Each structure stands twice: as C-alpha cells, then as structure tokens.
C-alpha cells in the first residue's frame, strides 16, 4: 500500500489585500504582517537553516528558477528553465546552460550578470562558509560564465533534480552580488548578512532585532516596482499574541495560523481567510521487512481501519484535505485518479 497522507492547509490572511475592517491597501500603502515566528539567524539564505528565513528571503533575493502555485518550475532570473527539449540540458544530461535576463539590476543599481551566479556558487561550496547543505551544488564539477548573460555548468554525474536545487526552490542560497562580497575569506560575519542587497521586489530597510523587519518596494525590480510601498514583518513567537494583534488591528495579516486557532480567527469581523495547500504531510510508514507488514492485505487492512477524515477534521478544524498520495493536491505530480482507500473496519477484518 502506498503510505497515506493528510495534507494540512496553511492559513494565509491575504498577502493580496486582506485587512482589518475599514482598511484599504492601495498603491503607496504599508502592510504590517505577523509573518515571523522567531528571530532569524541571518537574512542571508545561504547561511540560514530556518524555514522562516528561507521563505521570507524570496521577497528581497533572487534565484535562477522558482516554483509557481502548482509547484511547476518557472524561470526567474534565468530566461527559461533548462530542459532537454530547449537545449538547456545536454543529451548526456551532464551540462546545464542558463541564459540570464539582461534587464536585472541589484538594488544598488549594478547589473546582475553571470559572474554573480558563478561567484555565488563558489561561496556556497566554500568550506569556510557555514552553509546548512550543499545538495545539488556538490554535484558540480565545473562552472563558467560565458560573457555576462550565460552560465555553463558541468556535472560530475547525472542528478535529475539539479535544476530545482541550483539557485532554485529546493536549494540553499540565493544569487549574491559579487561586486559587494568579493575578497572575503568567508561570509559568515559580514555586515551584508543583516541587510542583504538582492534583486527581489523588496529591499531590506531595517532589522530591529526582537521586533520587526522592514522592507521597501524596490524601484529597480525587473518586473516593475511593487504597488505596496512598505512591508513590516513583526517577529511574534507566541501564536496567541499574533491572533490578538490581528484582532486589535495592530497587524494587517497573519500567516501560518495554527489550525487550533482557526475558529477564533473566523470569529473576527472583516477578516478574509485564504486557505492554500502546503506540502505538510502526516503519514504512516510501514517496515516492509516485518513478515506481517510484508503482506499487502495487512497494510491495506490497517489503512481501512483508520478513520482519516475524522482525524483530519479534528486536527485542522475543517481546513485540511484528505489525499491518497505523498504529493500536494495542487501540484503537477499529484495523481487524482488514484482510488481512495475508505474507512471500512468490517472490510479490514475480512482481509485478515
């Protein structure tokens, strides 16, 4: 039996405009978020192992590729996602070529080029830097910039998820500005880590430790300046405090709400709730070396004996989705045609 999964849903109270009653956010406005559960260890994603920082960094840093809301890989700083079909991946699958957009500038006005990508790669694999993981980058045998807008990577061996890891959504580290960071033996303690210069839609203005991080719209952003002038991310570890600040209007939006607090959030007048799928799976894994569990009928009987829907409803207050695979239900890899195993204790007994 395929391991069963419960897909919980995150609560995102409106990056696109959820607010307290009577508040309208238009161009030139400021949004205050309860977006960080703890103090970041660094604002440089290369040196961070915290989910908050890695997710938050996409606001001010840039990557070669990113994922859309269906988990499809799409280009960001790269002009296109390298594939066999478009020639970005060689027939032997050992050479990957990226063509960099020519209209991208760092937040200080300098152009972002292929040399920045090569520099950032060398920073990640530098053993002196305290990088959490080098998965994907460790597979690189050689890398070179061809002019200002082409990066050619040669792999040591075939590594199918390489494009997802190399300055992509699964990897560690964003593209960093060589002109600001060259010459350091390591990057562990440079001032850049507290106020990075990136190429994302917003730029870091101020980090008030223990309180908040303030970002301003980047007027040089290659997709155009964001319509929201300023974002303030409050650092609020206690979920109940986050809830009360949403209720009082001290914050405009609240991400990743604990499902146990969902009934209280729903009771706040004027608050819009957006439920978005996240890859948060709860499942049982079977030890197939066990003689009993090696029998598919035993595994199926166990699955049929668990009332997953009741568990899911109780745990998520109706915000979860029951799925029958180990992939998010909105992703390209999810197989919606799988026949669900339904709760059936009597049927389970007949299998044994």
Regions found by a protein language model. Give the residues of each.
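C-terminal motif of bacterial Sec signal peptides marking the signal peptidase cleavage site
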Residues: 16-17
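Short, well-ordered beta-strand elements
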Residues: 28-38, 79, 94-98, 120, ...
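N-terminal lobe/hinge region of extracytoplasmic solute-binding protein
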Residues: 34-90, 122, 195-199
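Gly/Pro-rich hinge or "lid" segments in bacterial periplasmic/extracellular proteins
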Residues: 68-70, 169-226, 230, 240, ...
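Aromatic- and charge-enriched surface segment that lines or borders ligand/interaction sites
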Residues: 81-130, 146, 152-154, 245, ...
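Surface-exposed binding/hinge segments that line
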Residues: 134-182, 206
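Ligand-site clamp/hinge motif
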Residues: 190, 218-264, 300
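Append "and occasionally in soluble cytosolic enzymes with long acidic Gly/Pro-rich linkers
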Residues: 214-219, 294-352
């Amino acid at each position: 039996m395929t391991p069963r999964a419960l897909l919980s849903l995150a609560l995102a109270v409106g990056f696109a405009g959820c607010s307290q009653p009577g508040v309208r956010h238009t161009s030139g406005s400021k949004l205050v978020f309860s977006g960080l559960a703890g103090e970041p260890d660094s604002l440089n994603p290369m040196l961070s192992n915290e989910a908050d920082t890695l997710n938050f960094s996409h606001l001010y840093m840039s990557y070669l590729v990113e994922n859309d809301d269906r988990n499809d890989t799409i280009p960001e700083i790269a002009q296109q996602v390298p594939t066999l079909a478009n020639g970005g991946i060689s027939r032997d699958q050992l050479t990957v070529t990226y063509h960099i957009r020519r209209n991208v500038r760092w937040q200080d006005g300098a152009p972002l080029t292929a040399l920045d990508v090569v520099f950032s790669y060398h920073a990640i694999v530098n053993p002196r830097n305290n990088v959490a993981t080098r998965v994907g980058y460790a597979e690189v045998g050689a890398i070179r910039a061809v002019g200002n807008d082409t990066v050619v990577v040669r792999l040591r061996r075939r590594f199918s998820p390489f494009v997802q890891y190399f300055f992509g959504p699964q990897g560690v580290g964003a593209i960093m500005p060589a002109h600001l960071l060259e010459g350091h033996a390591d990057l562990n303690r440079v001032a850049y880590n507290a106020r990075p210069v990136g190429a994302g839609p917003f730029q870091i203005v101020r980090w008030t430790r223990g309180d908040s991080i303030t970002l301003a719209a980047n007027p040089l952003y290659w997709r155009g300046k964001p319509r929201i002038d300023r974002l303030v991310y409050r650092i609020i570890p206690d979920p109940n405090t986050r809830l009360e600040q949403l209720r009082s209007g001290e914050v405009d939006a609240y991400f990743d709400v604990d499902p146990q607090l969902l009934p209280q959030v729903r009771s706040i007048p004027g608050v819009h709730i957006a439920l978005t799928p996240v890859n948060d799976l709860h499942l049982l894994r079977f030890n197939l070396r066990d003689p009993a569990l090696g029998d598919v009928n035993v595994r199926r009987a166990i699955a049929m004996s668990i009332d997953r829907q009741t568990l899911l409803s109780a745990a998520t207050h109706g915000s979860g989705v029951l799925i029958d695979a180990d992939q998010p239900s909105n992703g390209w890899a999810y197989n919606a045609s799988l026949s669900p195993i339904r709760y059936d204790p009597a049927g389970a007994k007949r299998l044994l």
